[in-house]
Regions:
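Short strand-loop junctions, especially beta-strand C-caps/beta-turns
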Residues: 12-14, 183-185, 238
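Iron-sulfur-associated redox domains of electron-transfer enzymes in respiratory
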Residues: 8, 20-74, 80, 84, ...
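Residues that cap or flank secondary-structure elements
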Residues: 16, 138, 148, 191, ...
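Residue-level recognition of alpha-helix initiation/capping sites
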Residues: 19, 141, 151, 194, ...
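Mobile "lid/hinge" segments at catalytic clefts and subdomain interfaces of large enzymes
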Residues: 167, 200, 393-397
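Fe-S ferredoxin-like electron-transfer domains
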Residues: 51-195, 201, 208-225, 230
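Generic start-of-chain signal for non-secretory N-termini
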Residues: 1-23
Length: 584
């Protein structure tokens, strides 16, 4: 409920009225008064650790941290007094004295919050000796931590605890040796980390980042430089909603088709749309759901989606008893890799081992997924050879000095380039469930359901990132849910275990908002106060769906051809071998 009680305050001698209970920081920024900060995350991390947000309050002798103190009636606040500016400078200088300032070679050099605050404060001289900690960290794990860049803001600790409920990070050491490390003295690879990457996208510096695989693709000995290799790039749905942000381009200009042209300029031989494999996933998953519904007593309910590896990892470590309830369908990434290394290789007369398949994903967990058992369908190694996050592919493009703004649009390649609107909404929370039910409805009734206000899929209630839905298919009502963030997943599972609710079909995405806000997406400071606010990226994908000539996965002609020529039918023996897992 919105607080309608107002208090009268002054900020920099300007009288204002703001809602009672408002934090000083919010009151200042909402009214156009800039107050810097490094640790603050609204409703998640409000601990005043960085001391950069200090302000002066008349009548209080000491400076006040604005992120965790509320306005009071009659309060007079100064945001930029000489005393405030000097305190901020000293605090940031002390942070820099324990920070590895290799800014020119840092992956966050263009969007480092610490660097920006230091620049805004006009810090041009190092007044304190620079000594930063160094800690051993495995270079092969998909998540990399550089202790020398950690400013102890505690964002990673809080986002993992409160949003994802995995408690991977904790404070270790005491006094000047205090730092952040993996909980329980574990190595990161031994922990329950789901690799959702939310700690990375909320880190103000490069203390946390994905393992960089760009050099393996674009280096002097990289895959693109090897003339004996046929290089294939496959692009996830959510990438098109965000890649242009790294180049200052609008979603209307930075389209999926312009990304195809860009990747061809980089040197990829083929560029395919993962939306195609999303349509393939829908064909398998919707038929699997219907098959289970025909034998309801044979299975435990609900059936969960399985295309998010962060969610699958969470289920394996936290609720292994639920694994039989996960769909056996592989993710679109892994389905595509299997199809490329078998069907596509045969069709083009290319030995599978001579194909390098690079998956471009909004996700860090995909870097681990490609190494899991059963992801080598062709018998010649991994189906997917490399995963590059959206951030990595943008760094690769920049390294090649490609002017994206001058490139034309270009279609995805055949025979695996056709996709539908149902495939593209995979990248947004609720999209997998909606796409699957569109096709399940057609399979049962022989008719396509209406889309939009007249859709048989009705939203019963929505609370934050949790949505409860119901669909009537020929008199059979399916009770469904779609949710994002692992904390929401835990709350739903616990509620089901207590017998408070029942569902037939549940979609879970590890990242708030779905893949559009994945751990591999471009980092935007505006997100760091609103971790669930990714409406613009969601609307981008919904727009692609609305404009699509085909909006049902079962109408994808390229998918139909794949079944006719190779897979035979959904859930066939060959489809099971290539497109499903035996166990988790």
């Amino acid at each position: 409920m919105v607080n309608t009680n107002l208090v009268s305050i002054k900020i920099n001698n300007i009288p204002l009225q703001v809602p009672e209970g408002t934090r000083i920081l919010d009151a200042c920024r909402d009214n156009g008064f800039h107050v810097p900060y490094l640790c603050y995350l609204k409703d998640i991390n409000e601990i005043g650790a960085c001391r950069v947000c200090v302000v002066e309050v008349k009548g209080i002798h000491h400076l006040v941290t604005s992120c965790n103190n509320q306005v009071q009636e009659g309060m007079e606040i100064l945001t930029n007094s000489p005393r405030v500016r000097e305190a901020r400078k000293i605090n940031v200088e002390l942070l820099l004295s324990q920070h590895h300032t290799n800014c020119p070679t840092c992956v966050r050099s263009s969007n480092c919050e610490l660097k920006q605050v230091a620049s805004d404060l006009n810090l041009t001289v190092d007044r304190y000796k620079n000594e930063y900690p160094e800690m051993i960290w495995t270079s092969t794990f998909p998540l990399i931590r550089d202790a020398g860049k950690c400013i102890k803001c505690m964002r990673c600790v809080q986002i993992c605890d409160k949003l994802q409920t995995l408690n991977i990070w904790d404070v270790s050491g005491t006094g000047s040796h205090t730092t952040v490390d993996v909980s329980h003295n574990l190595e990161i690879k031994e922990s329950d980390c789901s690799l959702c990457g939310q700690c990375v996208t909320h880190c103000p510096t490069a203390a946390l980042q994905e393992r960089d695989d760009v050099e393996a693709i674009n280096g002097i000995h990289g895959e693109l430089a090897n003339d004996d290799k046929v290089t294939v790039a496959v692009v996830a749905p959510a990438v098109r909603a965000a890649w242009g942000e790294e180049f200052g381009l609008s979603p209307e200009f930075a389209t999926d088709r312009r990304l195809v042209s860009t990747l061809k300029s980089v040197g990829f031989d083929y560029v395919f749309d993962v939306d195609f494999a999303a349509d393939l996933t829908i064909m398998e998953e919707s038929n699997e759901l219907l098959a289970r519904l025909q034998q309801p007593d044979k299975y435990s309910w609900p059936m969960f989606t399985s295309c998010c590896p962060g969610w699958v990892s969470f289920a394996k470590s936290q609720y292994p008893e639920l694994l039989p309830q996960l769909s056996t369908a592989k993710s679109p990434q892994q389905m595509f890799g299997a199809v490329i290394k078998t069907y596509f290789a045969q069709k083009k007369g290319i030995a599978p081992e001579n194909i390098t398949c690079v998956s471009i994903m909004p996700c860090m967990s995909k870097k681990r997924e490609l190494t899991l058992p059963g992801m080598d369908s062709a018998g010649t190694g991994q189906d997917i050879d490399y995963v590059l996050t959206t951030r990595e592919i943008c760094r690769l493009i920049k390294a090649d000095h490609i002017d994206v703004s001058r490139l034309p649009e270009c279609d995805f390649d055949d025979p695996l380039g056709e996709a539908t609107g149902a495939g593209v909404i995979f990248g947004a929370s609720g999209g997998v469930l909606e796409a699957a039910l569109r096709t399940a409805y057609h399979t049962v009734t022989g008719e396509n359901p209406e889309i939009g206000e007249q859709s048989p899929l009705k939203v019963l209630r929505q609370i934050g990132s949790f949505k409860e839905l119901e669909i009537d298919i020929k008199g059979v009502k399916l009770h469904c849910a779609a949710l994002s963030s692992l904390g929401e997943a835990r709350r739903l599972i616990q509620a089901m275990k207590r017998g408070e609710c029942h569902y037939d079909f549940v979609e879970v995405m590890a990242c708030p908002g779905g893949c559009i806000n994945g751990g591999g997406q471009p980092i935007r400071p505006s997100f760091q106060n609103k971790p669930k606010d990714c409406a613009d990226r969601d609307q981008c994908l919904r727009g692609y769906d609305a404009r699509s000539a085909i909006r049902f996965s079962h109408e994808n002609k390229a998918v139909q051809t794949l079944y006719d020529d190779y897979l035979e039918a959904p859930l066939s023996d060959r489809a099971h071998h290539l497109l499903h897992v035996e166990e988790y």
